[in-house]
């Protein structure tokens, strides 16, 4: 149909990170438009994949945000300094690394709330938690810089040149 319409089919491009392994089976397909695979996020983790219907684990998450506990006064609840302005309101919510039972809610602009029934340790005000972001695209747009870290050492500071450039 596309050939009959006179379209150039040298490049037949589409799909994305979540469908990269499906699109390659489409006849004539030449190019997959993956981009988020670089970072991954909670949305991709939860969609499932061709190899694992429960979780998309073809690529590991690399984009995280460090948040600080600012209140621990209530049993089963922590308050952090990362709300919707740091993590967006996208679903699913952020995943706390090392704490699979934590439920993160970034519903407030400036603060996040974590509820849990069990945790791996006792947390105090000032403790840091690393969270996997809900949706990488809008989260990157919220920051001026990205820190490239390897083995707990900052190797590079990268400016986000397109930050806030939505039109």
Please describe what each predicted stretch is.
Residues 1-167:
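Active-site anion/phosphate-binding pocket segments in diverse small-molecule metabolic enzymes
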